[in-house]
Design a protein with these regions (language model features):
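C-terminal target-recognition/interaction regions appended to catalytic cores
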Residues: 1-143
Length: 143
């Protein structure tokens, strides 16, 4: 889970350029030819910022070509552990059922952040309890 993804030599050059120039978005001319020109997704090949929230984690977090998944100050993409932390998984969470790095990336990238899931469930239960109480009051008034 803490193993660093192995970037291509070209992606190492791209990441080094971002660090050397202290920028977060790769200039258009340094992108692969197929991604140059008018594009709306400038965070591809982007670098995370310590002082800003991370973008949505997807199963592609191991490659900087999939989004803004470059470590803020290292020449590498996020590790699975770092991506899991961004998603809100506690460090003690057991990812051992994932037999491959790809399965691990899919599990982390497709997950609903645990804190968000807990908030949604709590809100649903509170709303459900209020609805039940309203139904009981309505039934007692109609009797």
């Amino acid at each position: 889970i803490d193993r660093e993804p192995q970037p291509t030599p070209k992606n190492v050059q791209r990441m080094q350029y971002l660090l050397d120039h202290d920028i977060y978005d790769l200039p258009n001319e340094l992108r692969p030819t197929c991604q140059q020109g008018a594009h709306s997704y400038k965070s591809m090949y982007g670098r995370l910022k310590w002082e800003e929230p991370a973008q949505t984690i997807t199963s592609g977090f191991g490659s900087i070509g999939q989004g803004r998944y470059m470590h803020p100050d290292r020449t590498r993409a996020l590790t699975a552990h770092e991506a899991a932390r961004i998603q809100g998984f506690p460090d003690y969470f057991d990812f051992s059922p994932c037999p491959t790095r790809s399965a691990l990336a899919t599990m982390i990238g497709n997950a609903v952040p645990p804190q968000l899931g807990a908030a949604v469930i709590t809100a649903f239960l509170e709303l459900s309890a209020r609805s039940d109480e309203t139904l009981r009051v309505d039934e007692s008034q109609s009797a």
